[in-house]
């Protein structure tokens, strides 16, 4: 039974256990775009979904489809209701993302013939293509992906203004020789602007590739754009509504109930979401004529928001699981699998932050979602939220005070990666700033030669600004920088405070020079933990951080900051969403063991007995211990203890 033959399913009650969604059709040399589009949908269905997923998909579609003229399809309200996406009909929620998602689906449903078929009616075949493209399951059919997917997403969001093109003089008065346009107008972004463009020579190759379903060129077909005559833009209003939806559903896991994230959007929550959306939006430079161009969109997404569209995957995967199906009466062996697939997960909405010594005054659900758009998990193929990384509270000025001793005690004893966050005020403009650094490796002191990490070597550190606008400086993978001992990612000293992304000058007995900014970005925090300097440059590849791929023109090269709060969160990788993995225990236990050792040593020093009642041997032993610990004696003693870098170092002369 064919997808386009929905009228044959008027008596549809339940799907077949072995679905055959598409009819076997004869190959025709004059196959039109709709037939080729159907063939691509068939290949997507058979190669990208399991038979059980197809069965669930078909059940979801036909149970909710609207029928008109023998054609079954989904309208905007049906799609929004199924995905639990708020739209303009929800007066208590100004999110209004339903029309944007429907617009995207109507465009992607016409793939790869957006020029002639878009906007498409959301039939089953169209929805199959939408789900495959938005969940990135097309890898088994299409050999190209990420860059062209960004182009597709841009086309699905863009408002296009096409320049008027004067026809050559010889064409005047020959309108009768021009074929009438198709009744399906499509999206202007995909209309060919120059019929003599060189890429026309590839049309037959693209059609042959699509017809044979070896679709290397499928993204190119019907998408020829002459950049000299097109002005394609995404309006800020459209993109803002999509960003707000992505911020709300960013924590969404597969099969999680979407309404957990969309039903309780009060005014305070929506204000926070709007602020983060505006910070992200500010990273996309607007054209003079208004809106966001394709080049800006593609460059900014690639360099600054590699995981921005990740929430769309679990969102649209809900189409692959139906609540109505019960296979227990048909397949006893598959009962467990079917029941699990047909029952959405009731999320407990567990926070990414673990309980500890303080609660964050910087992190909020919206900021965490913002972080997940560019921060990886233990490997760079998953974002911070989808990789099940948890955040363990390590240090906070609000909880532990602005003391370097306290910072050293809490941070340098944490043997895992950290998320460094700072909230303060720009002393020049008065703007409130939120910035930070992602440090997948443990903090190092000058006496530390090696450290281990549970993060992949492909996960690099980064320096970022979250508000009032987004800037991301990725870590430099060059061995010439990584292997240099004088360019640590993060550096701590009681003489100069905290330095991230700086060059550390060699020290001497007479003077100790402060760290100096290096490369494209650095952060320097004074010993009082009350002020900081942020340096960002559009050039410089010799430092820890590379220049930002997208930098707003209003950004400054140097920003002086009054610190309101500073927080350090330990990165706890693990597969257990409750954060009870052995890795988490290892990180916490290592820190606790270090603290216990320090406490025992302090207790020993406190109970050293120098009274006359002790024998000479005991007296000498006690004196040696105190001199070694730096409690008594001077620089000419047999030993001394230094906590300059937050660790105990024995020095013998």
UniProtKB/Swiss-Prot annotation:
Pfam family, one: TLD
InterPro entries in UniProt: TLDc_dom
GO BP: response to oxidative stress
Sequence ranges of Polar residues compositional bias: 15-26
UniProt keyword Transit peptide, yes or no: no
Keyword Zinc-finger: no
Top-rank lineage group of the source organism: Eukaryota
Ranges for domain TLDc: 361-572
Ranges of compositional bias, category Basic and acidic residues: 1-10
Major localization class: cytoplasm
PROSITE patterns membership: TLDC
Region ranges (Disordered): 1-28, 165-194
Any one Gene Ontology cellular component term annotated for this protein: nucleus
UniProt subcellular location: Cytoplasm
Record key words, sorted: Cytoplasm
Protein role: May be involved in a process influencing telomere capping.
Protein family membership: Belongs to the RTC5 family.
Protein name: Restriction of telomere capping protein 5
Underlying gene: rtc5
